[in-house]
């Protein structure tokens, strides 16, 4: 198992520091050698930069990768978008010598060189491949009696030919990691549908973004779950703060708690909701908070 540098991206440190805290607590408890990545910038967002200025995207992404190469560590992301951007850039530069040379000519101006010695990992992909559900269960001290609506997101599993995660049309690897915590991953209609945040939709097409989200929330609500679990802070933002916008636009009253997988796993590893920053979310469901505090205290 290689040493890791933790790439937080933009949304985690600026909007959801609880995800950062939860991730670091989980990594420590699982005895994973991971450290911060000083100097890291935006990944940058694959659905924006890559689509209209590939050279700039590669230069910015490779700069982040080089920071980790210098530390002789692989990059660990907690965000689907960051994973997609960095993993795709890493792969393209390794496969295309001409593109690599062009990118290195840009990096040379700041005293850097991309060598291609680091791999890009997503925390879900990493835990599944390096631990697996059964080994992960050995660390669980507080099994979670929760029904979960799992959201994979887009960049974690696409493009499927590059992700090496098995069937990406009906995947199960993330479900298995959720159920390793004792929680139940509940199936629901349009589970694999985009949340409506990525690709510039949330920022450029707000109405369409909220319509997509409302459909997802309706399907999730009908499944009768305790919470939504995701693996991406941008999806997390969409489900959490987006619920408030959906309620205002459509006159609905959704109040579905939203957790990043690091927070769910943290609960199962024995950390309290307060330690994991769960109460920092926009959606505050008193019944859910009471339930997870009871679980955390061993009263459930």
Curated annotation (Swiss-Prot):
E.C. no: 1.8.7.3
Annotated catalysed reactions: coenzyme B + coenzyme M + 2 oxidized [2Fe-2S]-[ferredoxin] = coenzyme M-coenzyme B heterodisulfide + 2 reduced [2Fe-2S]-[ferredoxin] + 2 H(+)
First-listed, main subcellular location of the protein, grouped into a coarse class: cytoplasm
GO CC terms: cytoplasm
Cofactor(s) named in the record: [4Fe-4S] cluster
GO biological process: methanogenesis
Keyword Cytoplasm found: yes
Leader sequence segment: none
Gene3D superfamilies reported in the protein's UniProt record: 1.20.1050.140
Note describing how the cofactor binds: Binds 1 [4Fe-4S] cluster.
Domain of life, per lineage: Archaea
One Pfam family from the record: CCG
The keyword DNA damage appears for this protein: no
Keywords: 4Fe-4S, Cytoplasm, Iron, Iron-sulfur, Metal-binding, Methanogenesis, Oxidoreductase
Protein family according to the UniProt entry: Belongs to the HdrB family.
Assembly mode: The ferredoxin:CoB-CoM heterodisulfide reductase is composed of three subunits; HdrA, HdrB and HdrC.
Function statement: Part of a complex that catalyzes the reversible reduction of CoM-S-S-CoB to the thiol-coenzymes H-S-CoM (coenzyme M) and H-S-CoB (coenzyme B).
Protein name per the record: Ferredoxin:CoB-CoM heterodisulfide reductase subunit B
Native source species: Methanosarcina mazei (strain ATCC BAA-159 / DSM 3647 / Goe1 / Go1 / JCM 11833 / OCM 88) (Methanosarcina frisia)
Gene behind the chain: hdrB
